[in-house]
């Protein structure tokens, strides 16, 4: 029993040794060491990456907080004005000046344009249009029972808007636009037809139209940026608007224009100490509003594909980061602006920074260690290379006929079937030529098999040198060949077949030391365009059938259609 066990163990070790030879052992050891060194390096890289991402978010967060606080200050002012006007609308003051303004409105409301002003030093003027102008659209209306209260509340708003002005504000203009045909603005309007055009411009802006109860059921602050190019004499701006409602009735819209230039100056000041990275402010449609790049420097803008990738990420979270080519983009949604702030960090800035220096040192260490392993692996690489050469040689022998050096039957059918499927999907022509050497058996009988082999090799060489570069040819039987012509119509296949026939027929072969021989070939042609059938076996069978008829018709000829056969029979 022990002797039998020893034999079993020896057999098991031999099997293991055959499967895992010296080359495999060295390769396995190399891979294990390489794997562990790579894993350790990768762990350090991931830690470094997390630290880099956290650093980018911290830089972005500090600038975003400063910008958000400034925007919050402006939004609080807008809400304060709305609340003050709402209180004035619910409980209007019984001042004689306000009552007098209501009387003046009743007298002037039919005019094409009009103006009401209580005190030039303490309040803002009220501008309006006629009843006829208001009646042109259903968006506007003077049918409110609280029209007088709204008018006095707007005049009171003039006091608040003048008092609320501050040098710390980013706003260019604050205005209230009523659906009843009047407006109040911190920017004066020249008395005249400009009042009508300005009111029309206000009520046709998206920030006014989109504040209806149907389009803004939440009745909160909304931000708007114009999708159309700005005219040359008007600076680019964004608008925050807030509806005024009471008892489920929409009176008008309070709005605040913020110049993009003000946002740019504020953004540059906030990012002044951050020498790396560029900050960019986008609206809710990911249109670039402004950036912190110096005037002489071009901003790193995003292309359409990058914006689409960023939009998908923004939908998932309020902040994050994304690698876009050679840029790392960290982003954060602002709480008091319907948009997103980006920090774009380029690869050059990353390399020049602290994280770049650490990354370079870590990479060099890994490269040096890997180089040492690769040097020790050189001998095995040479062995593997020899194995590949042997494998390729065996593969060639498995796919080719050793005598003619063309594809054998199995390889030809496999490659031709794949080509036929591809050309069928592309709806391109596909043709097949079946070729047979005439009277080949008599060559073997008269001159021997060596002469027959010489004839086959000679014919294969002529076929290979005549067909196109992307055509394939193979030996499918004794003296029978098949030529696949992808992309060739039936007419083109006929031309190629004729060239092959002529070349074979024109060349003489030296079969013995003193004997030459001239051979000929018969061919049959089939094409997918005839019946719309791309099945290679069917095409080869049809070509073989026509080859048989070509031999019956006298040999050294080509048969390309069934119609030719019928004509020859008649």
Swiss-Prot record:
The active site is at 479 (proton acceptor). It is found in: Cell inner membrane. The record marks 441 as: Transition state stabilizer. Its cofactor is Mg(2+). GO terms for cellular component: plasma membrane. Binds 1 Mg(2+) ion per monomer. It catalyses: 2 GTP = 3',3'-c-di-GMP + 2 diphosphate. Pathway: Glycan metabolism; bacterial cellulose biosynthesis; Purine metabolism; 3',5'-cyclic di-GMP biosynthesis. GO terms for molecular function: diguanylate cyclase activity; GTP binding; metal ion binding. Keywords: Cell inner membrane, Cell membrane, Cellulose biosynthesis, GTP-binding, Magnesium, Membrane, Metal-binding, Nucleotide-binding, Transferase, Transmembrane, Transmembrane helix. The keyword Ribosomal protein does not apply. GO terms for biological process: cell adhesion involved in single-species biofilm formation; cellulose biosynthetic process; negative regulation of bacterial-type flagellum-dependent cell motility. Its EC number is 2.7.7.65. Mg(2+) binds at residues 436, 479. It holds the Pfam family GGDEF. It is a multi-pass membrane protein. Residues 428-563 form the GGDEF domain. Gene3D superfamilies: 3.30.70.270. The chain crosses the membrane at residues 20-40, 360-380. PROSITE patterns: GGDEF. Catalyzes the synthesis of cyclic-di-GMP (c-di-GMP) via the condensation of 2 GTP molecules. Cyclic-di-GMP is a second messenger which controls cell surface-associated traits in bacteria. Involved in the regulation of cellulose production. Homodimer. This is Probable diguanylate cyclase DgcQ. The lineage of its organism: Bacteria, Pseudomonadati, Pseudomonadota, Gammaproteobacteria, Enterobacterales.
């Amino acid at each position: 029993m022990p002797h039998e066990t020893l034999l079993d163990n020896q057999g098991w070790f031999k099997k293991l040794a055959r499967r895992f030879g010296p080359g495999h052992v060295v390769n396995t050891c190399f891979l294990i060491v390489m794997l562990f060194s790579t894993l350790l390096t990768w762990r350090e890289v991931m830690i470094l990456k997390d630290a880099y991402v956290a650093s980018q978010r911290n830089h972005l967060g500090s600038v975003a907080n400063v910008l958000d606080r400034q925007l919050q200050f402006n939004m609080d002012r807008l809400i304060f004005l709305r609340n003050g006007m709402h209180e004035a609308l619910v409980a209007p003051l019984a001042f004689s000046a306000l009552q007098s303004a209501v009387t003046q409105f009743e007298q002037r409301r039919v005019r094409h344009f009009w103006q009401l002003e209580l005190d030039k030093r303490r309040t803002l003027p009220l501008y309006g249009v006629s009843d006829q102008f208001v009646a042109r659209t259903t968006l506007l209306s003077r049918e409110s029972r609280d029209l007088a209260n709204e008018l006095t509340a707007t005049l009171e708003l003039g006091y608040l808007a003048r008092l609320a002005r501050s040098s710390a504000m980013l706003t260019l203009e604050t205005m209230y636009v009523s659906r009843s045909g009047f407006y109040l603005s911190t920017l004066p309007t020249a008395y005249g037809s400009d009042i009508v055009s300005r009111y029309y411009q206000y009520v046709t802006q998206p920030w006014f139209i989109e504040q209806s109860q149907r389009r803004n059921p939440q009745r909160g602050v909304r931000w708007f940026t114009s999708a159309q190019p700005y005219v040359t004499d008007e600076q680019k701006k964004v608008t925050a608007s807030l509806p005024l409602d009471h008892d489920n009735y929409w009176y008008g819209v309070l709005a605040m224009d913020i110049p993009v230039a003000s946002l740019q100056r504020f953004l540059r000041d906030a990012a002044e100490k951050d020498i790396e990275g560029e900050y960019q402010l986008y609206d809710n449609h990911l249109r670039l509003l402004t950036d912190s790049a110096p005037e002489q420097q071009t901003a790193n803008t995003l292309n359409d594909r990058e914006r689409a990738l960023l939009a998908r990420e923004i939908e998932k979270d309020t902040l994050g980061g994304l690698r876009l080519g050679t840029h790392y983009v960290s982003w954060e949604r602002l709480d008091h602006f319907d948009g997103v702030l980006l920090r774009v960090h380029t690869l050059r800035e990353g390399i020049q920074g602290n994280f770049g220096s650490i990354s370079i040192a870590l990479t060099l260490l890994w490269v040096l260690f890997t180089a040492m392993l690769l040097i020790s692996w050189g001998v095995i690489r040479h062995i593997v290379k020899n194995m590949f050469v042997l494998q390729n040689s065996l593969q060639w022998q498995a796919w080719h006929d050793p005598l003619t050096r063309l594809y054998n039957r199995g390889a030809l059918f496999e490659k031709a079937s794949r080509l036929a499927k591809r050309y069928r999907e592309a709806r391109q022509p596909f043709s097949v030529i079946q070729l047979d050497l005439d009277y080949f058996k008599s060559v073997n009988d008269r001159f021997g098999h060596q002469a027959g082999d010489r004839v086959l090799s000679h014919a294969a060489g002529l076929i290979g040198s005549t067909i196109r570069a992307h055509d394939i040819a193979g030996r499918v039987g004794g003296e029978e060949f098949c030529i696949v012509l992808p992309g060739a119509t039936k007419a083109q296949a006929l031309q190629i077949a004729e060239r092959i026939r002529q070349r074979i027929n024109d060349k003489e072969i030296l079969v013995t030391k003193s004997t030459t021989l001239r051979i000929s070939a018969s061919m049959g042609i089939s094409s997918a365009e005839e019946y719309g059938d791309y099945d290679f076996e069917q095409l080869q069978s049809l070509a073989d059938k026509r080859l048989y008829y070509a031999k019956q018709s006298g040999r050294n000829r080509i048969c390309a259609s069934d119609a030719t056969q019928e004509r020859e029979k008649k």
